[in-house]
Amino acid sequence: MSDEIIEVPCPICQKSVPWTNESTFRPFCSKRCQLIDLGEWAAEEKAIPSDTADFAMDPNVSDEWSIK
């Protein structure tokens, strides 16, 4: 096994981050960058692309799980 340490860029500030167990916030360089990223997800500035869910297509369609 190689002793080479892989480094990745922090997704927020692009600072180089070693990919080791000691890198507590990896892939982020710091708690600050980790929280900035979390805030972007919470504010819906980021999203995982997907097809629209079937239940979201027609709000008038009811099923057994709908609140009545």
UniProtKB/Swiss-Prot annotation:
List the SUPFAM superfamilies hit by this protein, alphabetically. Glucocorticoid receptor-like (DNA-binding domain)
- What is the protein's known function? Inhibits all the catalytic activities of DNA gyrase by preventing its interaction with DNA. Acts by binding directly to the C-terminal domain of GyrB, which probably disrupts DNA binding by the gyrase.
Higher taxonomy: Bacteria, Pseudomonadati, Pseudomonadota, Gammaproteobacteria, Pasteurellales
Subunit notes for this chain? Answer: Interacts with GyrB.
Cite the entry's keywords alphabetically: Metal-binding, Zinc
Would the keyword Transferase turn up in this protein's UniProt record?
A: no
**Span of the signal peptide:** none
Citing just one GO molecular function, the answer is: DNA topoisomerase type II (double strand cut, ATP-hydrolyzing) inhibitor activity
Organism equals Haemophilus influenzae (strain PittEE)
Q: Which NCBIfam families match?
A: PRK00418.1 (NF001638)
Cofactor(s) needed for function: Zn(2+)
In Swiss-Prot or TrEMBL terms, this protein is called DNA gyrase inhibitor YacG
Similarity-based family: Belongs to the DNA gyrase inhibitor YacG family.
Binding residue positions for Zn(2+) = 10, 13, 29, 33
Q: Which gene encodes it?
A: yacG
InterPro entries for the chain: DNA_gyrase_inhibitor_YacG, Znf_NHR/GATA
- Cofactor binding: number and manner: Binds 1 zinc ion.
| Pfam families, sorted | YacG (PF03884)
Q: Name one GO biological process term.
A: regulation of DNA-templated transcription
